[in-house]
Amino acid sequence: MVVFIGREKELAMLNQAYLKGGNSIVVLYGREQIGKTTLVKKFVQDKTYVYYQARELSEKEQNRYFEKVLFSVKEKAEKERIVFVVDEFDLMQKGYKTFFADFLMKFDEFPKGQVMVLFVSSAIGWVENDMVSDMGELAKYMSLPIKLKEFTFVEMVDRFPESTTKDCILIYGILGGVPGYLEYWNPKESVKQNIVRLIVDKKGVLHTEAQRFLKTSLRELPFYLSLIHI
């Protein structure tokens, strides 16, 4: 079971955007394993919503799947205010270069004041450097992006109330404040046992995490991997 800790500020920002009314677009972004999905689930738990997991598809395939979702959005929005979540939305335009321009036309057709679009992304570099220009006219409907960062040490300590201060310092030093990593840590085991099980063991869930993260986050992967092995 995933424990919801921290994120009060970000949750309040999402709720404020929802209560503000009007058709709007909010962008929530942050690295993988940072807790975006957990926050979104918490946010929509008392709201009517439509969820779409974006994939990198051709324009034809993207349209086929997305049109069905848009129909559901319009149908629900005719009756009540809803949240339309598009997870990893940056993937939409990779094989569909006019996605944002086309979505703008669909956005304008939504019932007035009934739809809050929540775009979610793990592509930090793209969101911070290219998103606004790629979105074009659609960007004018967007509020300030919300970036999820790692837990602070104090927030991390709340996750392990029975652990000693020393152990919490070690946990934070090893895993940082990444919620997805912290979920794997077993406070009933020693620090050494956790390290062996999660990282040292070749079958450990975090054994190859450093390379995987670099591969998805950095453009010049071979260069950065060479630094690791120096």
Regions found by a protein language model. Give the residues of each.
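Conserved small helical "lid"/interfacial subdomain of P-loop NTPases
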Residues: 143-168
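Walker A/P-loop nucleotide-binding motif
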Residues: 23-40
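Conserved small/polar residues in nucleotide/adenosyl-binding loops
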Residues: 228-230
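Conserved P-loop NTPase "ATPase switch" module shared by AAA+ and STAND
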Residues: 77-99
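Amphipathic alpha-helical "lid/sensor" segments that cap RecA-like P-loop NTPase cores
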Residues: 161-213
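Conserved NTP-binding/hydrolysis module of P-loop NTPases
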Residues: 46-52, 56, 60-75
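Sensor-1/coupling segment of RecA-like P-loop NTPase cores
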Residues: 29, 91-99, 103-135
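N-terminal pre-P-loop "Q-motif" helix
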Residues: 3-14
